[in-house]
Curated annotation (Swiss-Prot):
GO terms for cellular component: cytosol. It comes from the Bacteria. The lineage of its organism: Bacteria, Bacillati, Bacillota, Bacilli, Lactobacillales. It comes from Lactobacillus johnsonii (strain CNCM I-12250 / La1 / NCC 533). This is Glycine--tRNA ligase beta subunit. Its main location: cytoplasm. InterPro entries: DALR_anticod-bd (IPR008909), Gly-tRNA-synth_bsu (IPR015944), Gly-tRNA-synth_heterodimer (IPR006194).
Amino acid sequence: MTKDYLFEIGTEEMPAHVVSKSVKQLADRTKKYLKENGLSFKDIKTYSTPRRLTILVEDLAEKQEDIDEVKKGPAKKIAQDKDGNWTKAAQGFVRGQGMTTDDIYFEELKGTEYAYVHVQKEGKKASDILMGMSDIVKAMTFPTKMRWGSYDFEFVRPIHWMVSLLGSEVVPVKLLDVVAGRKTQGHRFLGDSVVLANADDYEEALKSQYVIANADERKGMILNQIQELVAQHNWKVNIDKGLLEEVTNLVEYPTVFAGSFDEKYLNIPDEVLITSMKDNQRYFEVYDENGKLINHFISVRNGNSEYLDNVIAGNEKVLVARLDDAQFFYDEDKKYPLAHFVDKLKNVSFHDKIGSVAEHMARVQIIGDYLGKKFNVSDTEMKDFDRVSDIYKFDLVTSMVGEFAELQGVMGMHYARLIGENENVSVAIKESYMPTSAEGDLPSTTVGSLLSIADKLDTIISFFGAGMIPSSSNDPYALRRNAYGIVRILLNEGWSLPIKDVLPELIQLLSGKTAAKLPKDAEAENEIADFIRDRVKQQLQVEKYDYDVIDAVLASSQQDPIQILAAAKTLQMHHDDADFKPVVESLTRITNILKKAKYRNANDIDESLFQDVSEEELYAGVNALEENTDLSIADLYKGFVELQPVINNYFESNMILDKDEKVKNNRLAQLLKVNNLADRMGDLSKLVIK
């Protein structure tokens, strides 16, 4: 027999961002607990609101299965001493089964007698096992916790009630002074408490008390109501998934409504209005049918439609107060010339161990000028870069960014446009911060891409130079995000940048032109290069390359992210080709021979020492590949496919480790040339070949 089991934790209002994760945690911990205790079930459904975390275990077995089995113990000669007394081994064996030595009997197995016991145990009732739900609640973790009363216990918010029903039977789980029963609470203002006759009554009973316990159903209600409202007015709304999730977890009974504000505020940049509405008030911004932001917003009330006019008026009043502040900041900032703000950056600390923001910008310009030449950026774009690198952080000291820190770069773009900076310069100010997350948008302009890379590269160099290097668990200055941003932009632009090769030149250029500490030696420079190169692995994982392909390409000495990605594409593309296995096996054989011989010297090859035509053929083939300076990774692989029979013939026709030392070293030098070329693709020995 099976029954459904309902368990609800009723709390004070929880922060919206923890609700979904917390109910999932409750379900996962319960699932593990039930499996460990041998209680079978069909599935676990979750319900959650700001005031409750609930699970419904479907078709839970009413008891554990009875145990009726024979357990084998130690051999008789170990279970008893020579006088027939029970040893500690025998006593430990029966103790583990909950039995005594009187229960032991012996049977022969393959010529040896062993101790056995016949274990018969009635399974525990589910109601007894479910009393352990209190331990599950105690074990739950949260980003922040609260204590209440005099209890030595923490939870996300104080617990006021619990429901624990196995079918129609109360399982009186106790936590602190709260004993679980069958009474749950409806909406704080619209509903009453409700007594549940059965676990299956939960969802419908709460609906009668203005609580939609199913989060997906609440989300669907919100979306449907928004769509109805939008259709009535010919509006458009961009549904932000994060905001939708948040408002879903802010309400128990959603009612969508629309409000408005004076059109005069539309002179403020859209991003300011959207931030005021979305981030501060949890409103959805509204657009007309042409995609232009208009003076309306959509919000969600935690309740029904009664007195909705009062709710709308209250929300409009709060928003207008915020927009008045934004208008004031916007007007104040426009009173001053750009130079007024730029000059202030001399007194704004980038970091107390690194210097001012103005010094950071100066270093960024040096780095960008150097990289611009490497990337063949046009003279016109370099002129724009030099201009924007002089000013791009100016909005940090504006009133608007002081109030809305998340708009740094965005406000710089708008203010730059207002004073007549060209579009390349204006947009690059905003794009210097891109990408703002692992999946964030990348710069759309060459100048923006160059500025963003230079900014991030200086940040990494400066913090590493000052000894503030991220640990495996701590990265307070988001240096990994900066490094990953560099990699993503390089790949997006198709810019070749062998990090380890250019760092010494860059640091030399910066020396003497900054008060910030710089990496002091080649080891420190290599640490930075490896840190950035490690982010290439992240990109390869995002693009879902096979793990062995990733391991292979990252084990090469290649420093250029573009070339590493090209190698991954090539190896992945040809992985299932008929000629892939023989090519990889030939090249791996070369690597293994060189390792065994401990041969690393790049000696010149003496053609006069060749003793077989196969040596001449390999020499010519490798030279042809080496001399093609524009050879792509894809073409290099094709070259090795064509060269594979030549390599095989070389092995068949020559004793590599010849008795003649000169001949041996000459042949090893030949193989080293091949190996160095193959290393451009990766360490092929790491590939899994089927």
